[in-house]
């Protein structure tokens, strides 16, 4: 969410005064100096085929003209547009948790998390609500949308997130043709990308909120991992399409802040969600994954930051609350292990396709 981290978690200047009576979905948009994206993002939301939603923008102490623009935007429709202004940058996790808590208090069926550097298609919210309604038993925790690249909408940006035995996260379909049949089929995924994902609000009471120790990066993998440990599912919903710029807040694919936090959070993710036996079984591929990443970031000029992040994660891991690992059935751990193996193989194949395509020119 930003290039500065703070330990403050619940400081804000203005509570939105929402009184939900018939709206089903609360759209939560964290913002940090994202004025260049906000007009297009809000314009797309105003063209939705359903109107049973409200929009809450949570600003993480932006500078510049963001606040002036947001006040004007909110005043145009105060019943359905809400604004919460933080005095400090709470990161992605802290900001969206404020929205989720309000959604729980106000009785919204669904919480839609949306990055400010997105443009949703007109039937986006309708498609997600419709799919959630097809799950009357409430076993679907989250829906990951079909994210395509803003500069080339025919190319996939994210079709749900995966997690591997190497301790790496990757995006399904990244860079592939969005029209391929495989990306137009619903499927179970390991995690929803929280840049454009709908969550069943009530299940946060069981699964827990986003971990604010993460601040930003891998927090969506963490909450989806927990949901699976507790027996819930995460699905990829191809009918909900959104265009995405990518790295709109952090500003680049790799930078010192992002590399350090991602490294630290990768340690947090394992510590919180894998029991000791599972860590022992997977120790070799995990060590290999950390080594390869260290060498990769050395070449990129961020080797020191990656190592510092890993060490910080190891040193501070006990500050975190683990998932309720003792309550998870053994067969569920086996199921997750098999998925990690499958996703590791998929990652290798995806990488192979990418380099084969490059070689062919």
What are these language model-derived features?
Residues 108-119:
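Short beta-strand-to-loop acidic/aromatic patch adjacent to the donor-nucleotide binding site
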Residues 118-164, 168:
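Conserved donor NDP-sugar-binding/catalytic core segment of glycosyltransferases
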Residues 44, 59-69, 88, 118-121:
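A conserved acidic beta->alpha catalytic loop
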Residues 279-361:
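Non-catalytic, C-terminal membrane-associated alpha-helical segments of glycosyltransferases
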Residues 43-52:
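Short, acidic, metal-binding catalytic loop of nucleotide-sugar glycosyltransferases
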Residues 156, 168-170, 177-199, 221-223, ...:
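A recurrent flexible, glycine/aromatic-enriched loop bordering the glycosyltransferase active site
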Residues 190-241:
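A short, conserved alpha-helix in the catalytic core of glycosyltransferases
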Residues 71-106:
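Conserved donor nucleotide-binding strand/loop of the catalytic core
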């Amino acid at each position: 969410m930003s290039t500065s981290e703070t330990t403050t978690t619940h400081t804000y200047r203005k509570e939105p005064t929402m009184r939900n009576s018939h709206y089903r979905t609360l759209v939560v948009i964290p913002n940090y100096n994202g004025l260049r994206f906000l007009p297009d993002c809000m314009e797309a939301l105003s063209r939705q085929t359903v109107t049973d939603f409200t929009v809450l923008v949570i600003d993480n102490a932006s500078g510049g003209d963001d606040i002036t623009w947001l006040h004007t935007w909110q005043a145009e429709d105060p019943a359905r547009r809400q604004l919460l202004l933080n005095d400090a940058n709470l990161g992605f996790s802290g900001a969206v948790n404020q929205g989720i808590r309000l959604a729980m208090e106000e009785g919204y069926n669904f919480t839609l998390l949306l990055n400010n550097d997105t443009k949703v298609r007109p039937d986006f919210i309708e498609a997600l609500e419709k799919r959630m309604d097809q799950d009357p038993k409430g076993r679907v925790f989250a829906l990951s949308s079909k994210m395509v690249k803003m500069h080339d909408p025919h190319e996939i940006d994210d079709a749900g997130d995966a997690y591997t035995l190497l301790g790496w996260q990757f995006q399904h379909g990244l860079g592939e043709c969005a029209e391929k049949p495989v990306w137009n089929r619903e499927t179970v995924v390991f995690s929803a990308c929280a840049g454009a994902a709908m969550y069943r609000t009530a299940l946060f009471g069981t699964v827990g909120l986003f971990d604010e120790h993460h601040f930003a990066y891998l927090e969506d993998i963490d909450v989806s991992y927990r949901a699976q440990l507790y027996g819930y599912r995460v699905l990829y919903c191809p009918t909900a399409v959104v265009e995405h710029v990518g790295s709109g807040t952090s500003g680049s694919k790799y930078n010192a802040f992002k590399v350090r936090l991602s490294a630290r959070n990768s340690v947090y993710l394992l510590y919180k969600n894998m029991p000791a036996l599972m860590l022992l079984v997977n120790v070799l591929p995990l060590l290999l994954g950390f080594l390869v990443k260290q060498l990769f970031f050395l070449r990129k000029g961020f080797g020191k930051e990656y190592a510092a992040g890993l060490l910080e994660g190891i040193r501070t891991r006990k500050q975190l609350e683990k998932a309720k690992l003792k309550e998870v059935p053994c067969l569920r751990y086996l199921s997750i292990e098999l998925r990690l193996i499958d996703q590791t193989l998929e990652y290798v194949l995806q990488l192979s396709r990418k380099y084969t395509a490059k070689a062919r020119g």
